[in-house]
Design a protein with these regions (language model features):
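Glycine-centered loop/turn motif at secondary-structure junctions
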Residues: 28-29, 82-85, 156-157, 214
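Core segments of cupin and vicinal oxygen chelate
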Residues: 2-5, 9-49, 93-95, 103, ...
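Vicinal oxygen chelate
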Residues: 6-15, 56-131, 134-143, 169, 215-305, ...
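Conserved short beta-strand elements that form part of the metal-binding/catalytic scaffold
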Residues: 29-62, 106, 110-118, 161-191, ...
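Alpha-helical elements of the RecA-like P-loop NTPase motor core of helicases
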Residues: 21-22, 51, 75, 112, ...
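N-terminal beta-strand motif that seeds the catalytic metal site of vicinal oxygen chelate
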Residues: 1-18, 48, 61-66, 118-146, ...
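Conserved active-site tyrosine of GNAT-family acetyltransferases
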Residues: 20, 24-25, 81, 109, ...
């Protein structure tokens, strides 16, 4: 079993590379670590690679990387994947700060890249914009969330943190409540991507920046139920939904089996569970129509997450 330690970076294709680079540097506050004609690599202010952008015909997320333990044997992992009928390839993609990667496709067609060697990219460089701490999680629309959850559990060692009814599952690979989410829909695509901020003041400052730049907040601020994170949502120039969050639940001891207690928890202790649809926020406004716009691939569901 693979057992990732954390999410690394996500790779996107875009028809307008300069526009998206400008958004991630000037608005999101990521650091442009390296760039050539058709690619750009962006790191957090801490120095971890977070986003790779490739020039392409369609706006989409193609690859997600995960860090595995430094002693991991890629040959042994490849043999384990082969037993599950999954083809893998050991590659060196010349990604700044990342060593060789073992790549394979998950059951929805996204490339997964495992790495065990990495280095910092100019940490603590001056930045503009928001300056998130890290890439926190990615959510996907999938036809069968239970089937995808089974793949991520059996093949990659993820654990289920929560369900909303039977259509939305949250999964973790470390202490963070979720690193991947899967919601039921008719066409597989990214639902949203999330960056972690330091605290509520950091989140408030990001809202002020959105106001200055006339970027609409399409949901929030609010406190979610599953994960209990404070969050806001907006769209980037490629019309993809971006979440900013802080105060996410943590499972600090897997054997105890409950999330680290917080005053806003409604269950004591707060354990993984199935939430009732439509009752999954502690407080805050409902999603705006703009949040749901162009999400025709998602089957009709009650208000989510």
């Amino acid at each position: 079993m693979i057992k990732p330690r954390r999410i690394g970076h996500a790779t996107f294709e875009t028809p307008d590379l300069p526009r998206l680079v400008d958004y991630y540097t000037e608005v999101m506050g990521l650091v442009l670590a390296e760039r050539d004609k058709d690619r750009a690599f962006l790191a957090t202010k801490i120095g971890q690679l977070a986003i790779q952008i490739n020039k392409g015909d369609v706006e989409r997320c193609t690859t997600v990387s995960f860090e595995v333990a430094p002693e991991s044997d890629f040959g042994a992992l490849a043999r384990e994947l082969e037993k599950d009928g999954i083809k893998s390839e050991l590659r060196n993609d010349s990604v700044p700060s990342i060593g060789p990667v073992l790549t394979f496709k998950d059951n929805k067609g996204t490339t997964i890249a495992l790495f065990k060697e990495w280095s910092y990219l100019g940490k603590h460089l001056a930045h503009h914009g928001i300056g998130p701490l890290k890439l926190g999680h990615i959510a996907w629309v999938v036809e069968n969330p239970a089937k995808t959850a089974e793949f991520y559990s059996k093949v990659m060692g993820f654990r289920v943190s929560d369900w909303i009814s039977d259509f939305f599952v949250f999964m973790r690979c470390n202490s963070d409540h979720h690193t991947v989410n899967f919601i039921r829909g008719t066409v597989s695509k990214m639902h949203h991507m999330a960056f972690e901020l330091k605290d509520f003041i950091h989140l408030q400052n990001s809202c002020d920046l959105f106001g200055q730049r006339k970027i609409p907040i399409i949901w929030g601020p609010l406190r979610h139920g599953p994960g209990h994170n404070l969050a806001t949502y907006h769209r980037n120039p490629d019309d993809q939904v971006i979440e900013l969050f802080c105060e996410l639940d943590k499972m600090v001891d897997e054997e105890l089996g409950y999330f680290e207690p917080r005053p806003w928890h409604q269950d004591t202790p707060q354990r993984p569970k199935t939430w009732e649809a439509g009752k999954t926020s502690n407080w805050g406004p409902p999603p705006t129509p703009e949040f749901h716009r162009a999400r025709d691939a998602v089957a009709a569901q009650p208000a989510q997450h």
